[in-house]
Regions:
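Conserved alpha-helical scaffold segments that buttress catalytic/binding sites
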Residues: 1-154
């Protein structure tokens, strides 16, 4: 790749799909399901979040990604994983998503791992909401980033 001379062998993927984990899935089409399965991506649906609790899910997620190493971790947080009750300003609003506390817990656990190297938070769109929803979504997005980068209550 031009500009990425440190990638000596372009045949080796930069990110292995088996090192990815999705949390909070609840609305997938057949193609998305097939894609996730075919690449061996670890995925936890909202059913599993409800069944095991977000604490156990995050324990399994971090064990899968980090194992017993301190490798760098990238968190990609899609705000539409959160229930629209808490974050309505997004293009894909599907009821039954992560609760306010579950979303924050994910970010807090990533911060506690000490391995966060980078983060993106996507799908925040303040133009797609009713009165007040834009502020709730933006405030939550800022809070999630703050939590993931180590801001804590104490």
């Amino acid at each position: 790749m031009k500009g990425f001379h440190w990638l000596n062998d372009e045949s080796i993927p930069v990110l292995l799909p088996t090192r990815l984990v999705y949390v909070g899935l609840r609305d997938l089409d057949k193609g998305e399901k097939a894609f996730i399965r075919s690449l061996g991506i670890k995925a936890y649906t909202m059913h599993e979040v409800d069944k095991f609790g977000i604490g156990k899910i995050m324990e399994m997620v971090l064990d899968h990604i980090l194992g017993r190493t301190d490798r760098p971790l990238h968190l990609s947080f899609d705000i539409d994983a959160v229930d629209p009750l808490y974050a309505p300003s997004t293009g894909t609003r599907v009821a039954g998503g992560l609760s306010y506390r579950e979303a924050y817990y994910i970010c807090e656990e990533v911060a506690h791992s000490g391995c966060l190297a980078s983060m993106d938070l996507v799908e925040v769109n303040p133009t797609l909401t009713t009165a007040g929803g834009d502020e709730r979504t933006v405030d939550m997005a800022v809070g999630l980033i703050s939590s993931a980068t180590g801001n804590s209550i104490l």
